[in-house]
Amino acid sequence: MIKLKVKKGDEVVVITGKHKGKKGKILKVFPEDSKVIVSGVNVVKKHTKSNQMSEGGIITKELPIHISNIAHIDPKTGNPTKVAFKFLEDGSKVRVAKKSGEIIGKEGK
């Protein structure tokens, strides 16, 4: 299993595949499969049959995509960037955009 540099709520962009260029927030992370669900990306329609518990119909939902197909969005420039880890003076470990040096995620807010 590889070290994931993504967290729920991160802003990402799809860099390969049929959804290339789409931006969204990470809704859920599956570390065991190295996949994530991104809002508005890889949306499919699922037809469901009615039963005693729920009505039938068409449901739209997002399917997971592999983390190698996404890149973080640099908070300073808005362009795709790679992520590095850095230790601050107080000893805390944060994620940093390699292009601009800005802190990524909730740690930077």
Swiss-Prot record:
GO terms for molecular function: rRNA binding; structural constituent of ribosome. Gene3D superfamilies: 2.30.30.30. Pfam families: KOW, ribosomal_L24. The keyword Glycosyltransferase does not apply. GO terms for biological process: translation. One of two assembly initiator proteins, it binds directly to the 5'-end of the 23S rRNA, where it nucleates assembly of the 50S subunit. One of the proteins that surrounds the polypeptide exit tunnel on the outside of the subunit. This is Large ribosomal subunit protein uL24.
